[in-house]
């Protein structure tokens, strides 16, 4: 069974707690679908090409239909010509948004956290706060976790803690409403404040 590592106030291992049963046996396809939708919804969709009807010019037939020995043509803006429109090119009007229902989103997060638990990379701590506001103090916390990159979930982020974590390239500080399966799976370790963790378990 997957377990979360409980840390003391010095961010050292104090004990372990088993993850709830409803975190177990979830189909990993839920995570795939959520990650796919999350990435699609981030898509900027800026690529756009003009079709033959949108390119300026080309209203006149360039040469007579018959008698030249060459192929017939109705417009110099045909995709066959240099300077012509693009056939089947990308359009910025296309909608790439994908929807994921609430239950599936929930199961994806539970699966991602369960995976972190199996890897020994899910940590629970009573409070995450850097009162000094110094980056070196936040870096010391991350170093104690011992992972290449860390997702830190804190309720009501104060300014000092925000400033301390802001410049760390290997740590990402978020509030509970920002936590999702994509982020939980992307980082090597996840550190969650106890009140946030209890809320996650209760909502499951």
UniProtKB/Swiss-Prot annotation:
Keywords: Ribonucleoprotein, Ribosomal protein, RNA-binding, rRNA-binding. Gene3D superfamilies: 3.40.1370.10. GO terms for molecular function: rRNA binding; structural constituent of ribosome. It holds the Pfam family Ribosomal_L4. InterPro entries: Ribosomal_uL4 (IPR002136), Ribosomal_uL4-like (IPR013005), Ribosomal_uL4_dom_sf (IPR023574). Residues 48-73 are annotated as: Disordered. The keyword Membrane does not apply. The keyword rRNA-binding applies. GO terms for biological process: translation. Part of the 50S ribosomal subunit. Belongs to the universal ribosomal protein uL4 family. This is Large ribosomal subunit protein uL4.
């Amino acid at each position: 069974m997957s377990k979360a590592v409980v840390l003391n106030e010095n961010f050292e291992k104090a004990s372990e707690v088993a993850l709830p049963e409803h975190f177990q046996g979830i189909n990993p396809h839920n995570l795939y679908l959520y990650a796919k939708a999350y990435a699609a919804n981030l898509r900027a969709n800026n690529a756009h090409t003009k079709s033959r009807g949108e390119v300026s010019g080309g209203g006149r037939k360039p040469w007579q239909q018959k008698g030249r020995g060459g192929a017939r043509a109705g417009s110099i803006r045909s995709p066959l010509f240099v300077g012509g429109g693009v056939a089947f090119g990308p359009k910025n009007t296309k909608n790439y948004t994908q929807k994921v229902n609430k239950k599936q989103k929930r199961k994806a997060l539970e699966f991602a956290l369960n995976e972190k638990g199996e890897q020994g990379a899910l940590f629970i701590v009573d409070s995450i706060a850097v009162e000094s506001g110094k980056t070196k103090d936040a870096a010391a916390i991350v170093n104690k976790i011992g992972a290449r990159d860390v997702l830190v979930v804190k309720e009501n982020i104060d300014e000092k803690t925000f400033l301390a974590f802001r410049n760390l390239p290997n740590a990402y500080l978020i509030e509970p409403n920002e936590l999702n399966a994509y982020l939980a799976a992307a980082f090597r370790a996840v550190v969650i404040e106890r009140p946030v963790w209890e809320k996650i378990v209760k909502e499951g």
